[in-house]
């Protein structure tokens, strides 16, 4: 069997192999930093049921049975897109936050407890319930002040507006 590990590629990209599969670990991997959390989902798919069983067994040995998901290509692509929002975009927000703090000679460490608590909240409740902040409260005065502070950064200002409006629409 030949399997790929992509969250976005269709299983058909390896259809020239009669026994094809997908073994997609849903985790953020970095060349610089080794993986800290060994608990993560593995999504599997195969063209044959015996190969699917083999992929499930391998995944279960690595992460446990409860973290193995049988997903078709459409479902896997949806998971990957959601993961980009949840992981890649949130990390980019951390980068922006760090830049904003550095302007005032502040260290990113001041935000780490907030980041951890936010992540812990979404373990206990759904993200909509966990949402806080001026956009959620409809605090126009604070949002206007933030917009003034972001005047030197049109991209950050546009991003702030876009995300705030998205939060307001989903209140």
Give residue ranges: language-model regions.
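NAD(P)-dependent Rossmann-like dehydrogenase/reductase catalytic/cofactor-binding core
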Residues: 109-171
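Short capping/connector residues at structural and topological boundaries
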Residues: 31-34, 76, 136, 140
